[in-house]
Amino acid sequence: MGLLETNQYLHSQLEKSKQDFRDLTEKLLTSQATVYSLAKQLQKYKCEEYKDLIESVLEEEAPFEEGNLAEKRRLATGLGRYDSLIEAQARELTCLRQKIQEGEGVCHLFTQHAKNTIKTFESFIKTTDMTYYQRQRFCELLAQGSQMAERLASKLSTENHHDRKDEEGQESLAARLSMGLQGEEVNEVLEDSLDEKYLTHSSHHDSHRPPSSIASVCDVQDQL
């Protein structure tokens, strides 16, 4: 039997014991009221045989008059009803607390998984043929999923300052990944631009330079 099952079992036993105690208290009040009424009746008949017993009963407080007895029984019944409500709410709060703890653990696991996925994706996208915008979109979706999980964990957790630190770290990771993509894209653009300029310059230079055969003919003519 786990800790939760043991706790629920003990709560049920405690509630049962309290209910039994309330039932016995009500029966005791009824019995005391009955004894008090009988003592009053015997006093009227001046029964000498039970005089000492009657006096001992009547010397006690007289909370068992008809009005007082009804009030006490009403209070006992009301207290019993409120005790039942309190016990039910306590059990419900225990279950909710356990669900919150389980949800918090799941959120932390998902957040860690998202961080690991982003790190793996960061190294993977550098070897693919995806465009810059496709890579950036994937990074944004991964970062958004991780941040939503962290916000949910922050709402469920009582240590919100730790979750805020994790969220800041996640945002910096997403920003670093985005900046890395931008830097890679800029390098690609610069390389393409340099290659294009080099090819253009080479073709332009070659167009103004005569072919080797023509240059040789010109040299022979000059010698003649």
Swiss-Prot record:
InterPro entries: NBPF, Olduvai_dom
Disulfide bonds: none
Domain Olduvai: 159-224
Alphabetized Pfam families for the sequence: Olduvai (PF06758)
SMART domains, A to Z: DUF1220 (SM01148)
Region named Disordered: 198-224
Source domain of life: Eukaryota
Biased composition (Basic and acidic residues): 198-209
Family that this chain belongs to: Belongs to the NBPF family.
Protein name according to UniProt: NBPF family member NBPF6-like protein
Organism: Bos taurus
